[in-house]
């Protein structure tokens, strides 16, 4: 129902943008999450970043990138509305570029590329979320596209990735507005 063997839309998730604090009870769904890393030290650092962000209300920048990769840039159409909806909540920049570099204030980074360069030049704040909208970002090893682990290794606290072909349907990837709020 929520997966397709071919590139076709699937049933919408009732949990998307829902106010429920109890999805297992309300929707019979259990959101899947994992602590990912290639070593105990990486996972511990990830946990420590999460703890450091608790109740800190970090004042960072949200970067929403509109890229030249047409297959992975479908969220860009929602960026203007996201900026309007979250005005006064987060400092947000919509940039027409494939990647950012040399920024030390990254709280959110949404882009659409199979590989994101220059991650080593970025400073992710504790609690930062980063995502690159690919078919296989959730394949932690042996992927033909960048693994979501690269974000975590660069200092992000959270990322997202699929392990089966989602066919670039926007509902299969985090909505920046929902993820940030």
Which residues make up each language-model segment?
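Cysteine-dependent hydrolase recognition
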Residues: 1-181
């Amino acid at each position: 129902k929520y997966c397709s063997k071919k590139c076709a839309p699937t049933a919408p998730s009732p949990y998307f943008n829902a106010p429920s604090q109890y999805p297992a009870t309300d929707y019979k769904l259990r959101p899947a999450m994992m602590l990912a890393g290639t070593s105990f030290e990486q996972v511990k650092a990830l946990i420590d970043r999460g703890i450091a962000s608790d109740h800190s209300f970090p004042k960072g920048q949200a970067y929403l990138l509109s890229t030249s990769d047409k297959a992975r840039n479908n969220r860009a159409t929602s960026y203007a509305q996201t900026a309007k909806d979250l005005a006064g909540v987060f400092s947000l920049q919509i940039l027409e570029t494939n990647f950012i570099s040399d920024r030390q204030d990254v709280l959110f980074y949404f882009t659409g590329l199979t590989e994101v360069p220059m991650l080593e030049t970025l400073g992710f704040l504790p609690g930062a979320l980063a995502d690159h909208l690919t078919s296989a970002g959730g394949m932690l090893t042996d992927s033909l596209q960048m693994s979501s682990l690269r974000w975590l290794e660069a200092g992000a606290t959270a990322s997202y990735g699929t392990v089966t072909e989602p066919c670039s349907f926007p509902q299969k990837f985090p909505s920046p507005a929902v993820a940030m709020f």
